[in-house]
Regions:
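Metal-dependent phosphohydrolase cores
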Residues: 1-188
């Protein structure tokens, strides 16, 4: 279980999506994902933020099933933390779908202190393309939400107009959050 400074455990009610995004972005190179296109015209960072956001929404809705929200978010955000343009014809990027989970995990381990659930989420999110299935419910959720988001991004002209996703994306990318209608910034 994660602990706050001073040693107090983090309760599920204290897990805030924007706070987790901010802390991960400050501790890593997560913002660099904005430089790479993932699916369609969607940036890798926007994809990662959207996957984490929808996983968090589902985990809160399915509360009685006991999802561990902090590891869920900390594993979902860097699930595609491979930090290269897989569309380049570079031979090192061949078989990207099969290889990128291990690369993302290596990058995440270099930059972040991961617990076993977070590492499992990153490494197993490409099942069934990668042969070993996820073993924990958080990794299963990220695996499924990742597939839904990927298909949506391929067919959507402007994916994720949701202000919470856009604000979290801006936070991770080090940008100013989008304005709310009426001119004031959206609180995150």
């Amino acid at each position: 279980m994660r602990r706050l400074p001073g040693g107090r455990p983090v309760s599920p009610a204290e897990v805030s999506f924007p706070d987790v995004v901010r802390r991960l972005a400050e501790a890593s190179r997560l913002g660099q994902e904005a430089a790479y296109v993932q699916h369609g015209a969607t940036r890798c960072l926007l994809h990662s933020v959207a996957v984490a956001y929808y996983c968090d929404c589902l985990a809160r809705r399915l509360g009685p099933l006991g999802f561990r929200r902090l590891p869920l978010l900390r594993g979902a955000l860097p699930h595609d933390y491979f930090l290269y343009d897989w569309h380049d014809p570079d031979p090192a990027h061949r078989l990207h779908g099969f290889r990128h989970p291990a690369r993302a995990l290596a990058n995440a381990r270099r930059d972040l202190a991961l617990d076993p659930v977070e590492a499992e989420i990153i490494l197993r999110h490409m099942f069934p393309l990668t042969p070993v299935p996820p073993r924990c419910r958080e990794a299963v959720m990220v695996c499924l939400v990742d597939k839904v988001c990927s298909v949506y991004e391929i067919f959507s002209r402007r994916p994720y107009p949701n202000r919470r996703i856009q604000s979290a994306y801006a936070l991770a990318a080090g940008e100013k959050p989008p304005d709310r209608p009426g001119g004031s910034a959206q609180p995150v």
